[in-house]
Amino acid sequence: MKEDGLRRTLALMLLAVGLLTLGASPAGAITGNYQQDFAHSYVGLVAFYDANGTFTHRCSGSLIAPSVLLTAGHCTDATTGATQARIWFEHDAGVGFDPDTGTPAPSGYPDSGGVTSHTLYNYGFANFGGFPDTHDVGLVILDQPITGSRYASQFTSFPALATEGSLDGLAKKRGQQDVTFTVSGYGLSLVNPVKSVSFRERLTAAEKLNNLGNSLTDGFNIQTSASPGNGRGGTCSGDSGGPLLSSSTDVIVAVNSFGLNDNCRGNDFMYRVDRGAVLSWILAHSPASERSLIQIVSL
């Protein structure tokens, strides 16, 4: 069985006329100085399938209400062929899966177990159209609330979303190297032309703020350092849709969106959720009975 984690890689070409032309190929595990993640139990491994039940790709995501999983728009984009999903919240959800023989992990990944969804929403991601405002946010609505599943005991609370404009003040702040974020996901941990390493296990790492106001971010994305130096880590294929958390809190400020190369080196780019239109869209596409449970807080 071929098993692909999804991440978006942005190829940039600056034309002589000064226009930025964007081309995209699949891009979005934790790399560098990562550690096993037992703290962010609301981060799940998401496998997507087409209408026939054939696996299409995998991502990461955060359960922000009993039935609402926040991920990236390129994960739920209809052009992937995905119409349904299955989510596991074990920290070692995919450990033991053999892609050569198709033998599933003890959790059942990628064929059984977990919780299911037949409702996928894409905020408007369309192959980086409108860049840098790529609308790269998605929702996976569970068929049944998590409270009725085997994972119920993990969810005594849910992560919050950062209120509108929470990151705006950082755009002009000096000493950005001191602003720390936390990433979590189930993606690849090493990619190079020779090999890739995938634990399919929830891992976490710290990242540092690089930029909020250049041509690649411009108020819509946040650029963080993916360099493994100085105790930091980064993200890679399969981490797409996973959370970018403010410092060491459980407040989500962005979702993992894209990188600039296929080897997961350099910088990571996350699509911000601390924007009024995004927050309104999330609430509007969440079950009415759960909207009041989605926390939106100030940093």
Report the location of each language-model feature.
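Short, hydrophobic/aromatic-rich segments at coil-to-beta transitions
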Residues: F38-V46, V179-F181
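Sec/Tat signal peptide C-region and signal peptidase I cleavage site
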Residues: S25-A29
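Conserved catalytic-core segment of clan PA serine endopeptidases
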Residues: I30-A39, G53, A82-S166, L170
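C-terminal subregion of chymotrypsin/trypsin-like serine protease catalytic domains
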Residues: Q36-Y42, H57-R58, S62-G108, F199, ...
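Bacterial N-terminal signal peptides
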Residues: L12-L22
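Short loop/turn motifs at secondary-structure junctions and domain boundaries
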Residues: A51-T54, S227-P228, G233-S237
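Chymotrypsin/trypsin-fold serine protease catalytic domain
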Residues: D133-R232, D268-F269, R275-S280
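Bacterial N-terminal signal peptides that target proteins for export
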Residues: K2-L12
